[in-house]
């Protein structure tokens, strides 16, 4: 995509969550392509151990089968109000008016008239590859662009990983980025772009 949109020119790149993690990896693998990078709550994943590989691969195989059977299909909703309710459940800070607006712009009726959120159910399937922190850090060290790492005041990692991966560990990893600036958005959760636009 970058080769099409900006051939030969470095770009400013912004990524949120998984997109922030992907942007960080890309910036270290292709440092000449990135001029500046903003990482919004793109934390990476908990460290893994080689002994986890057999179980992880078995889980991946089981989840691929479940995906093929349609057991992981994304939920659809009766109306845009249902989508708005789901958004507010995921983000308690989101008011009804903003949730209704987002629902209308994020989801759309499918062929059966049910409101569907764009996405790929395959994202529910666990990655068969273990996350290797040492590899991620080697990639971070190659990032030549200035990086702004933005986190929300609410501790998303604590909510998701229950101590398996902490904000302190994330900050320690980010210290491998040569040109790092960190910022914190107050009164915001993981969807900080909704909470404090």
Can you say where each PLM-predicted feature lies in the sequence?
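Internal catalytic or translocation cores that form aromatic/hydrophobic pockets or channels
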Residues: 21, 40, 50-93
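Glycosyltransferase donor-binding loop in the core domain
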Residues: 75, 189-192
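Short gly/ser/thr-rich secondary-structure transition/capping motifs
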Residues: 126-134, 163-165
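Post-His helix in hydrolase/transferase enzymes
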Residues: 178, 193-197
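Conserved hydrolase catalytic core segment
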Residues: 4-55
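Serine-hydrolase catalytic core
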Residues: 97-98, 136-143
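Conserved alpha/beta-hydrolase catalytic His-Asp/Glu region
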Residues: 71-130
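Conserved loop-alpha-helix segment in the C-terminal half of the alpha/beta-hydrolase fold
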Residues: 142-188
